[in-house]
Amino acid sequence: LLASSAASDVYKRQNPNYIEQFLRCYTFGTISGTYPGSLNSRGLCAPLEPGWEQNITQHFGGMYSGSPHKGMDIGMPEGTPVYAAADGKVTVANASDSWGYSWGYYVKINHAEGVDTLYAHLSSVAVSYGQYVHQGDVIGYVGSTGNSSGNHLHFELYLENNRVDPYPYIGTDLLSKYLERTF
């Protein structure tokens, strides 16, 4: 918890518009016409409601069972809604294999060319393969399926099929800047 609080303080200092950026991501609702091929101007938003930062239990890159952790774990009660971080198309909606490559029940969404997010250890999945979702749509619910030691959301961000730390991209325009530079 102390490391999480310190990381949050550093993030806030590096992003003077933190509150504005954070709050705009919680204006949920339908965002028109941004998929396929682009993210809307709000960028990547948190997959959980406000307060999630205090519940980070494992950061990206930390050691877990002898290897680097490839996502961010956020401890939340079972059944907490999980939201799409951006508009996109569901490319995986695993609701039948509770082991699911150790992710348990999970959802993967393609948001733009080369940008994907993954939401794992869900208690249930609320979307289907091929479905288009909008930022803020409920896609599943926090659980503890797969290789999990308790209820939490395992959240991953992929850029060009490489897992990267999602934390700096949440509520900022970093992803838009990355896409401008890359494409």
Model regions: which residues?
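Surface-exposed, glycine-biased beta-strand/turn segments
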Residues: 32-105, 135, 144, 148, ...
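Short peripheral tails and domain-boundary helices/loops at the edges of structured domains
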Residues: 116, 120, 158-178
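Zn2+-dependent peptidoglycan hydrolase active-site motif and core
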Residues: 84-126, 151-159
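Sec-exported extracytoplasmic/periplasmic mature domains
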Residues: 23-31, 138, 144, 171-175
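Extracytoplasmic and endomembrane cell-envelope/extracellular-matrix remodeling and assembly machinery
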Residues: 13-42
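Single conserved hydrophobic/aromatic residue that forms the stacking wall/gate
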Residues: 1-7, 11-14
